[in-house]
């Protein structure tokens, strides 16, 4: 036994020395979204924010529309920054940015990876930035083998052309695992024109539409995890261009907005089914086969120095209207206290939804937030959260209680649920961090309790880093997921290796694990069964304009009972990215 312990200690030491510096991209995305775990992020939102990391927003040159559509700032912060820029000129340091009303040092540290202080007034920066041309091209492919004799593959390609801040055009095609033939099964594309003189934009193709707090319209998935104060208030981006491989979460059609004094008018027409049009032969005629719908809508916003009021309306134009919603929202910042709310009404279902919340700084190192929700026959809820930062310790705590008017099960008369979570991060020394997350879910139906405990030990120094995760979950049964990860990153090359095992006997006990992948590919598998998995990820910048990303993984199930044995599965991914 002593020899085994010695071997384990030696292997762990060697593993530490061969580890790589942990990438900060996912940490930056987690921070700006206000979530604590990457497993809570939507893949579409990850892809959007990762693109901002690759191409930070040049806030000194950005228009009001660009600042708002980034989704990084509240309306108060946008107005405050534009007012500061008009009075004092361009912001030349992050310390100066933190001094702008609504921008604290804490907030600036969160958004710093996503913004740039590029200035045409500085030496070496061209004055004709508004006419500069940028090209982005990404090509990816993957091969997967599972059941003997069964092999699957996929691919994707996307391209974007951007001319200053006047024109942006993007297109993408992709084929998913399981799709028949070699032809792409998903298409996406869009063109955006901006006229800064008239404070107007036109978008054709795939676009995003996000207004208020999302009760009437917010395409894509919203972060519903209320585990930190930053996640409570949604920062509506209005209309913005979509650039993803599939465009499955985007709206498709025509949209535009224009600024008139303190008002911003946005109008759009979404056409679900437009991408599904097929050409078929009927007798001797060749006719299109489609099931196309038309969903027009608009948003009218009145904006002031400290916030905004807006009204959103959307409906589906058919003989029998299947959808029609109207909402009114407000968001204001009064002496550092954010107050916001939205009320919407579904004219078809005759249901209302109301939410109201606030977040504020209690004292140095402590911020609190609360949110009330009344969703007609769906749920009534109240949530409270706090974030603390004291010396070497920081974290969050939250409680979210919900009551469901319609019972979730015929076996109970009262449906109540309460979720609590506590996160603690301790910076032991400069290169060693300990993280712990404890969450509990109590409900009156189904499995009454769900307890999740996770700890992470993170080591990072120079070009070396390592992470050890230990996760145990108790619901119907008890499940475990553990892994060790390390790699190397220096100059133009980075390599990450991970080895883990899992024991999950019930689907209700599944544990999601974030896996490193290439840009635009968000990988969060649900661990289920009894097995081992190994992954290796590499990123290589082979030229000033080109990068190669590679990922290989293998999952086996050697610990499964004989009657449930299943074969392992292997996957290989390659992706080239060119920027010129």
Task: Describe each region flagged by the PLM.
Residues 152, 249-251, 293, 298, ...:
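Exposed, low-structure sequence patches enriched in small/polar residues
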